Amino acid sequence: MCVDFSLGELYTNFIQNQIKGFKNLSIILENRLTSKTDIFVSDSVIESLSITQIIWKRPPTPLDWEMFGDAIVDVKNKSKRM
């Protein structure tokens, strides 16, 4: 998973620390997009990106976090089937 917000490194680190709280999901955080990245979390869509993108224009709400968890489960289930 790559996390990158246009609001800067401090905000990106804040979101990354929140994501680290999902310990039971075994999330690997990356500082940049790579061929191994399967989820991109940001405030900007990258049109050419074919992986799951989670876009938050404002601080995430409880519903955003629920959808985040669902997206992780979906990606993990897809990778198990491959």
Regions found by a protein language model. Give the residues of each.
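C-terminal structured domains
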Residues: 1-82
